Amino acid sequence: MIKMRVRFPTLVLLLGIVFLMAVSIGIAYGEKNVIKNHERPQEREQEERDPRQQPRPHHQEEQEREHRREEERDREPSRGRSESEESREEEREQRREPRREREQEQQPQHGRREEEEEWQPRRQRPQSRREEREQEQGSSSSSRRQSGYERREEREQEQEQGSRSDSRRQRNPYYFSSERFQTLYRNRNGQIRVLERFDQRTDRLENLQNYRIVEFQSKPNTLILPKHSDADYILVVLNGSATITIVNPDKRQSYNLENGDALRLPAGTTSYILNPDDNQNLRVVKLAIPINNPGNFYDFYPSSSKDQQSYFSGFSRNTLEATFNTRYEEIQRILLGNEDEQEDDEQRHGQEQSHQDEGVIVRVSKEQVQELRKYAQSSSRKGKPSKSGPFNLRSNKPIYSNKFGNFYEITPNRNPQAQDLDISLTFIEINEGALLLPHYNSKAIFVVLVDEGEGNYELVGIRDQQRQQDEQEVRRYSARLSEGDIFVIPAGHPISINASSNLRLLGFGINADENQRNFLAGSEDNVIRQLDTEVKGLTFPGSTEDVERLIKNQQQSYFANAQPQQQQQREREGRRGRRGHISSILSTLY
């Protein structure tokens, strides 16, 4: 009994101790869960704020765990934890450790996943605030890119519309505006310009790579200094009058040239051109055929100026002294020029400007003009061109003529000067409101310059000649024409020219020997009209009678009224309007 009494208090004491331990364990475990539950939202919020944050070092996590253990020991009412509790805590930490490692392994891959999702459709999953912001930024950037594409498309459309309004000049390889000329020399007395190469913009004009167009203009009482060139020239005066002097080793010849006069100037021939008029400017156009290098030619001047050097300056001192049997200083002073001596001469002559300061186009006095024109010959106004002298493009009757225009032509077989060059010259006059009927040249390529007036032309070609024959597409090349413009008519390409004002055209025909001009409409020289009647019915969709009636409907040849049907329609509408006005007045009276 006594033993039972002793054991009972002991049992109660043990139960009390166990109860206290359980209570302490429960309190500690509850506090730990509260701390852990309080820390996890912060960790998730930190991960959402910066998902690419690098994992914390392992020793830092160990320090934090040890610090938490010490805090938990301080909170316990008992003397400390039992070994079983510590072991359970370590087991819980070990269970949490693999989860952290998995999270750490997933964090470096998050950036790659976002990069992949930029190029792939996003998955249907909940998004954080940061992801939503990124998606909004991505959508805004894509919208900006899309708006940029739209702006670029709008600019391209505007450029395309601008090119259309500009007569498709940029897409027309056969048209060259006057702005395509490049200035070689320019001063206050005039200028010399050259057109860009024909084959520079398209390989369709490859056969014209050895032909260039040169134009020079000079004011009254001026002289273009002597020079020679490594190119053959065919020269035509378009405005004013000129006196040209051609110098050969054994003689010198001078010719007076008027508007429409032409002259062959062989390569290597020294020449100089004078504008003798007191009031009118001189304008000359030349077709250049280079000798040494296709498409390139050079002018060689014996004198030096601010625009070019004398070809004598290219020789050595010893060569010049031996050539002229004179000291070099004297040669330099007389031929090449000395800057110091030029300044002294200017001071002695009252600062008067020297010819070397003016350039290649200089002013001359009236006395010098009279002396230069003393022995000049005039051009031939009648008959065939001579072998050496100038000739006029309108010296003979036009080959095509009616009340709407005139067509002059000098073929190689009628022009001894251009026969070896295989060049023909044409001069076309189209009256205002008239049309040069559609036609094509059998083998000649024509380079046409607008001398005066305005109009437009339509040239028919093939869009892509590299395709097969059954895939070729007809294309119309058109442009507005004004003074100074140039266009090319390839062989076999039909063309028509419409004059909105009195139009004057100068043409150089290349490969012109035995060329034949074939008109596609009109009462004469019409190749369509020469087709057999049965062939006409088989060629066109209309009946044979309709085709015959349509072809014969045009009574004019070569030139015609540009808008006959429109004018008749306007006249009929005007008469109909007047009758309607009178009938309305009568109806009000009665």
From Swiss-Prot:
Region described as Disordered: spans on this chain: 38-175, 340-362, 374-396, 559-579
Functional description taken from the UniProt entry: Seed storage protein. Accumulates during seed development and is hydrolyzed after germination to provide a carbon and nitrogen source for the developing seedling.
Organism phylogeny: Eukaryota, Viridiplantae, Streptophyta, Embryophyta, Tracheophyta
Glycosylation sites: 239, 498
Record's protein name: Conglutin beta 4
Subunit details: Component of globulins complexes which accumulate in seeds.
Keywords of the record: Allergen, Glycoprotein, Seed storage protein, Signal, Storage protein
Gene: BETA4
Low complexity biased stretches: 137-146
Other notes: The variability of the residues taking part of IgE-binding epitopes might be responsible of the difference in cross-reactivity among legumes.
Keyword Transferase: no
Similarity comment: family membership: Belongs to the 7S seed storage protein family.
InterPro entries: Cupin_1, RmlC-like_jellyroll, RmlC_Cupin_sf, Seed_Storage-Functional
Residues of the signal peptide: 1-30
SUPFAM superfamilies cross-referenced by the UniProt entry: RmlC-like cupins
